[in-house]
């Protein structure tokens, strides 16, 4: 199967090239990047060497669709929407890593991504409704039948996978959920950004986007679908001075305050027992971002405070892999009829 990587020179695209160049099921048919178009790949990225040393090409529907079956769109928010319909009309399947199709309503996207909406005059509400939310552990069957997959954001991935077992079975209350997350600097992308300079964020930790972070509404939308009830929650992200990694601590209130940590761990383990990339840790063992770095795994742990009936769920992922491109490859595998984890048997280089 021929795969076009559109936006190949950003962090998401670079990860995609690195993963697909080793995968016998796929051939990289197109590398797109407007700023570097006309240059050889190996000149730009000698550390991800490609034997045929292809040119990076200008991003256009004609170039992308010429020899490709699937387009992996690793583009800024808003830009994917300018290509998606035309690519679908030419028979390609599309996996979008941006937020353009994560919402079932175009109006909701315009409200949350108002800056992008002012630039990109979209009229594709039908595609928003058609797109499948690409969280493989939750939506595998729908992904297998889809032609347009909207990959989740990194923060939503780190929050929804831990929450899903407890929301879907009514174990926790719908009110009072709090998500406290930390992300490495690569979550901000590859473009220059003052707040991501070493002298700005090194040796420090800071919160940002309180209450109105864009991923809040994405988490709430999917959590509400999983629960069957409207969910409103608190989400606070933090920037930590590491290149990659994401850690989330999630708080909720148990409907049955008699449940123990062991009970909640067994439930979590049973829910994800068929997923090789999800590791449920023993009670009182808590995940570290170091354990998942450079892998597509998610480590989970759970603890109950029996004094007040509250549950604490923890997760750790690599934000560039399970939080982004690794998850996109999972979706690609499912759409192509392969094992979800094909080509993603990655090992951590601890420490």
UniProtKB/Swiss-Prot annotation:
Catalytically driven reaction(s): N-acetyl-L-glutamate 5-semialdehyde + phosphate + NADP(+) = N-acetyl-L-glutamyl 5-phosphate + NADPH + H(+)
Alphabetized GO MF terms: N-acetyl-gamma-glutamyl-phosphate reductase activity; NAD binding; NADP+ binding
Enzyme nomenclature, EC number: 1.2.1.38
One cellular component (GO) term of this entry: cytoplasm
Primary location recorded for the protein, binned into one broad class: cytoplasm
Cytoplasm listed as a keyword: yes
Location of the active site: 154
CDD domains: AGPR_1_C, AGPR_1_N
Keyword annotations of the record: Amino-acid biosynthesis, Arginine biosynthesis, Cytoplasm, NADP, Oxidoreductase
Purpose: Catalyzes the NADPH-dependent reduction of N-acetyl-5-glutamyl phosphate to yield N-acetyl-L-glutamate 5-semialdehyde.
Name recorded for this polypeptide: N-acetyl-gamma-glutamyl-phosphate reductase
């Amino acid at each position: 199967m021929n795969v076009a990587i559109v936006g190949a020179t950003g962090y998401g695209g670079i990860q995609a090239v690195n993963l697909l160049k080793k995968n016998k099921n796929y051939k990289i048919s197109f590398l797109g990047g407007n700023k570097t178009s006309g240059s050889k790949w190996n000149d730009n990225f000698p550390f991800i060497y490609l034997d045929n040393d292809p040119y990076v090409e200008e991003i256009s529907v004609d170039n992308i669709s010429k020899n490709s079956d699937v387009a992996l769109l690793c583009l800024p928010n808003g830009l994917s929407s300018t290509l998606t319909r035309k690519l679908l009309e030419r028979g390609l399947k599309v996996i979008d890593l941006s937020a353009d199709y994560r919402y079932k309503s175009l109006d909701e996207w315009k409200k949350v991504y108002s800056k992008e909406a002012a630039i990109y005059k979209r009229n594709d509400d039908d595609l928003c409704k058609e797109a499948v939310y690409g969280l493989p552990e939750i939506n595998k069957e729908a992904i297998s039948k889809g032609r347009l997959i909207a990959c989740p954001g990194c923060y939503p991935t780190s929050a929804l996978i831990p929450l899903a077992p407890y929301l879907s079975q009514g174990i926790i209350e719908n009110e009072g959920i709090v998500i406290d997350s930390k992300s490495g600097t690569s979550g901000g992308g590859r473009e220059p950004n003052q707040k991501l300079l070493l002298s700005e964020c090194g040796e420090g930790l800071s919160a940002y986007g309180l209450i109105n972070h864009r991923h809040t509404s994405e988490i709430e939308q999917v959590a509400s679908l999983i629960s069957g009830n409207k969910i409103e929650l608190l989400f606070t992200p933090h920037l930590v001075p590491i290149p990659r990694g994401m850690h989330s601590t999630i708080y909720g209130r148990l409907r049955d305050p008699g449940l123990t940590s062991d009970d909640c761990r067994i439930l979590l383990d049973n829910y994800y027992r068929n997923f090789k990339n999800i590791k449920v840790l023993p009670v009182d063992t808590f995940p570290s971002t170091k354990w998942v770095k450079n892998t597509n795994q998610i480590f989970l742990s759970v603890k109950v405070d029996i004094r007040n009936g509250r549950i604490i769920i923890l997760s750790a992922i690599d934000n560039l892999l399970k939080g982004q491109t690794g998850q996109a490859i999972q979706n690609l595998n499912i759409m192509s009829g392969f094992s979800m984890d094909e080509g993603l048997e990655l090992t951590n280089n601890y420490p």
